[in-house]
């Protein structure tokens, strides 16, 4: 996943 955005997963 991304560090700042959870929806990047």
Swiss-Prot record:
Tissue specificity remark: Expressed by the venom duct.
Protein's name according to its UniProt entry: Conotoxin Am1099
Post-translational modification: Contains 2 disulfide bonds that can be either 'C1-C3, C2-C4' or 'C1-C4, C2-C3', since these disulfide connectivities have been observed for conotoxins with cysteine framework V (for examples, see AC P0DQQ7 and AC P81755).
Chain positions with Cysteine amide modification: 9
Subcellular location: Secreted
Presence of the UniProt keyword Disulfide bond in the record: yes
UniProt KW keywords: Amidation, Disulfide bond, Ion channel impairing toxin, Secreted, Toxin
Comment field on protein domains: The cysteine framework is V (CC-CC).
């Amino acid at each position: 996943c991304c560090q700042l955005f959870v929806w990047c997963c």
